[in-house]
């Protein structure tokens, strides 16, 4: 019987799953789209049962129906999800409200300032290696405590999306150590433990789950979960992690200097480093197993920019938009765009940032507008890479993955703007592929995540074209200057992202 492993990833706009054998061959795969809700500007949520758990059940049934061997051959399960998210549950394990999503949700700006004023920015950074931002969970937890007292009164545990799925599968409350970086100021980065000394007015420590490494077995599949999923009872379930970490693993990040660049609805990148490197503009973290470290960051919008444009000006397919962009040229007809349509994460850490189209004229075309957004993504990636290099963290090899990476036009523009070669893996499943490998590591079929090269092969290399370098260098300077010149005009009005 060919031993195999199930990996499943819950993303911002879709969920994907695959069953992979011990040699890294994909036996079957499936995906399902879903939406997120935006009840108010700056608020982003998903229903934990309908989307997170519902997608898991749907995809399990689909995979098991397609699997051409006994389901008993599945020797491990791992999940990854968007994150860090905030989901309060009651004593019965029932969600009390929709899950609050990661850095694109900016409702807790007042709470960020409140925590910083009470504890001090430098105290928080010294203990956790993080600056508080819209990516941080604790300000959102405090927001719930202040604004939804009826929810807070019933809250027994606070989970992230992956933790909720692991709970549904095993009955155990867990959080992986990589994802715990999102819980500043109550997570001690170096000790890898919860730290009650800075929790104070935020929450009681017993509301937090148990901390485990991502490939550690959290428990076995319960009989109830087996009946619901169709999986055999007793299958080991590992702790899992955030989607970007599994995406990095699934693209072949194994050595220090390897960097995963994920292009999805948003962007996230992970650079493997030889040690912890806390930097104010980014997020330093332990990685998926003891002795592994990363520096991470990401842009708030990438694929969502092009989705917005297509929905706002309907009637053209993605291919038609890209063909129009081909009729434009480097420099996008003089249009410079700022891609901050949902604020910006790294390196700006500015949730109040706004999108901008600058330099338009009656001669501007739809292709110029589309290309200006493509170039804006490239400029944003370049900004991040430059700031990481200033901090002493350099990428020796970049692996590109995610739905937006399927656009060779976009990938070439980003490569030309940054001057960095990008590699595309042969297997493009991404996070769920990394999840399957995590499940295999948890089952002791591999000794370490560093053996991922036994599964992953790189297929294509995209190298920079020098012909447009001068144009893009000038465009990049204009891009940087445009943000600095307009940021004071674009501050969010009072009350837009939260309750006063």
How should these model regions be labeled?
Residues 6-7, 116-128, 133, 142-174, ...:
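Active-site core segments that coordinate phosphate-bearing ligands/cofactors
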Residues 24, 47, 77, 105, ...:
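Residue-level signal for inorganic ion chemistry
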Residues 74, 206-208, 395:
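Core-facing hydrophobic residues within beta-strands of well-ordered domains
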Residues 101-118, 436-437:
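Short alpha-helix plus adjacent loop in nuclease-associated cores
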């Amino acid at each position: 019987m060919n031993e195999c492993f199930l990996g499943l990833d819950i993303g911002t706009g879709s969920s994907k799953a695959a069953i992979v054998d011990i040699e890294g061959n994909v036996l079957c795969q499936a995906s399902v789209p879903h939406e997120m809700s935006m009840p108010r500007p700056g608020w982003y949520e998903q229903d934990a049962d309908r989307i997170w758990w519902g997608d898991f059940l749907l995809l399990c049934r689909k995979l098991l129906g397609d699997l051409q061997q006994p389901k008993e051959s599945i020797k491990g399960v791992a999940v990854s999800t968007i994150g860090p998210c905030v989901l309060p549950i009651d004593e019965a394990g029932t969600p009390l409200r929709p899950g609050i999503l990661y850095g694109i949700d900016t409702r807790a700006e007042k709470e960020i300032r409140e925590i910083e004023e009470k504890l001090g920015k430098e105290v928080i950074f010294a203990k956790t290696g993080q600056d508080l931002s819209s990516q941080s969970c604790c300000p959102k937890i405090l927001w719930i405590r202040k604004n939804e007292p009826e929810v807070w009164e019933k809250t027994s545990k606070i989970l992230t999306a992956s933790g909720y799925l692991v709970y549904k599968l095993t009955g155990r409350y867990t959080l992986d150590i990589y994802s715990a970086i999102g819980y500043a100021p109550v997570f001690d980065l170096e000790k890898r433990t919860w730290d009650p000394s800075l929790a104070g007015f935020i929450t009681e420590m017993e509301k937090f789950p148990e901390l485990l490494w991502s490939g550690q077995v959290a428990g076995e599949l319960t009989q109830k979960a087996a009946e619901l999923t169709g999986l055999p009872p007793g299958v080991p379930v590992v702790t899992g992690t955030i989607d970007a970490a599994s995406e990095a693993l699934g693209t072949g990040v194994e050595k220090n200097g390897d960097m995963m660049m994920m292009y999805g609805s948003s962007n996230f990148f992970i650079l493997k480093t030889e040690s912890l490197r806390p930097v104010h503009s980014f997020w330093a973290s332990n990685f998926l197993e003891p002795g592994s470290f990363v520096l991470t960051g990401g842009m708030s919008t990438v694929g969502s920019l092009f989705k917005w444009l297509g929905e706002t000006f309907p009637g053209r397919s993605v291919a038609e938009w890209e063909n129009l962009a081909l009729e434009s040229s480097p420099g996008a007809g003089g249009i410079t765009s700022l891609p901050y349509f949902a604020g910006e994460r790294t390196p700006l850490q500015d949730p109040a940032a706004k999108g901008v189209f600058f330099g338009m004229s009656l001669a501007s075309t739809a292709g110029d507008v589309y290309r200006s957004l493509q170039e804006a993504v490239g400029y944003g990636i370049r900004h991040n890479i430059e700031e990481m290099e200033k901090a002493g963290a350099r990428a020796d090899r970049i692996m590109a993955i995610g739905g937006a990476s399927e656009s060779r036009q976009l990938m070439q523009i980003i490569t030309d703007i940054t001057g960095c070669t990008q590699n595309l893996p042969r297997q493009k499943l991404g996070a769920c592929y990394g999840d399957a490998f995590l499940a295999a590591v948890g089952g002791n079929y591999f000794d370490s995540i560093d053996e991922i090269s036994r599964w992953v092969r790189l297929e294509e290399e995209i190298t920079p074209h020098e012909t447009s370098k001068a144009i893009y260098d000038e465009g990049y300077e204009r891009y940087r200057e445009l943000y600095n010149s307009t940021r004071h005009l674009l501050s969010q009005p009072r009350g837009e992202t939260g309750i006063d």
